[in-house]
C-alpha cells in the first residue's frame, strides 16, 4: 500500500535545472496537499580556491560570507514565490556536502520523497563532475524524482 505523500523535499542550487524541478515539486505538492521542504546546501569553498597568496584565510571567509548571503537572498525570493502560489513551504539552508545534507534532511524531516533537478550532463563531464542528483538517488531511503534541466 502506497504511503500518503505529506512532505516533499525539493533540493535546489538555484540553477535553471532546479527551476524545472521546482515546477514538478509544486505540482506534486498541490496534487497531494503536501508541504514542501525547500533545501539549499552551501558547499564549502575549497581553501585552495582562495589561494594562499591572496590573504588565504581572510579571503576564504569573505567568499563563504558572500555565498551565504546570496543563498539567503535566493531562498527568500523562492519562498515569496511559493507563498504567492499558496504552497505550504519551509526553507532549510544547510552547510556541507550537498548530497549528504539532502539525504540527511530527507530522513530527519521525514520527507515522503525528494525532487531534484539534473543538469543533463553526459559522458566525460558527468564522469568527472559526478552528479549530486545521482548520489542522492543512490543514497536516499525515500523515492527520488529527478527532473532533467533541458
Predicted regions and their residues:
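Small/aliphatic-rich secondary-structure junction motif
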Residues: 2-58, 81, 85-87
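Generic structural signal for helix capping and beta-alpha/helix-loop junctions
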Residues: 45-46, 99-101, 123
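Gly/Ser-rich helix-loop-strand patches that form or flank binding pockets
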Residues: 4, 27, 104-150
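A short acidic, glycine-rich active-site loop
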Residues: 57-73
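Structural beta-alpha unit
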Residues: 1-4, 31, 77-114
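Hinge/beta->alpha junction and helix N-cap segments in small-molecule ligand-binding domains
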Residues: 42-43, 68, 97
Amino acid at each position: 500500500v502506497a504511503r500518503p505523500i505529506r512532505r516533499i523535499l525539493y533540493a535546489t542550487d538555484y540553477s535553471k535545472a532546479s527551476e524545472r524541478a521546482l515546477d514538478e515539486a509544486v505540482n506534486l505538492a498541490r496534487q497531494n496537499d503536501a508541504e514542501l521542504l525547500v533545501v539549499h546546501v552551501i558547499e564549502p569553498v575549497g581553501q585552495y580556491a582562495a589561494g594562499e597568496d591572496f590573504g588565504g584565510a581572510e579571503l576564504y571567509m569573505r567568499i563563504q560570507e558572500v555565498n551565504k548571503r546570496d543563498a539567503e537572498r535566493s531562498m527568500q525570493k523562492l519562498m515569496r514565490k511559493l507563498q504567492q502560489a499558496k504552497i505550504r513551504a519551509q526553507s532549510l539552508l544547510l552547510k556541507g556536502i550537498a548530497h549528504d545534507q539532502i539525504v540527511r534532511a530527507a530522513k530527519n524531516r521525514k520527507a515522503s520523497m525528494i525532487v531534484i533537478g539534473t543538469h543533463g550532463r553526459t559522458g566525460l563531464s558527468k564522469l568527472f563532475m559526478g552528479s549530486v542528483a545521482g548520489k542522492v538517488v543512490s543514497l536516499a531511503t525515500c523515492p527520488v524524482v529527478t527532473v532533467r534541466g533541458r
